[in-house]
Amino acid sequence: VSGSPPTPPSARRHILVAEDDPDIARMLERVLSAEYRVTVASNGFEAVAIAAKKPPNLLMLDIMMPGVDGLTAARQIRELPGLKNVPIIFLTAKDGPLDVIKGIQSGARHYITKPFKLDDVVAKVKKILKT
């Protein structure tokens, strides 16, 4: 609706991005924060801790991260109260067929390999969050 006031940040859908490459994390945060609340974690352990305090509407996880990897973080986050069905997008350099199968079997809606087109990622986010 044209002319309607902007949605206050606190009412926006929350995306938790777990990415250990600071350049990619900043780029995703910059682009997605125009429409969503974005929280960035630099590893899987941090992502699980953030999700427990601020439950996300969408997880965007790198698979290869130090400490707790994205697959493990996704499993742990989905064990948290109310997050069993939180949608997941994996963003990763792991592009082998078995890697993709593991990602999809872990419940991911999308498995996007790096390098990726930012427009494609944004389109997938919008489709999942219906905005």
Ranges and model annotations:
Residues 116-126:
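C-terminal output helix
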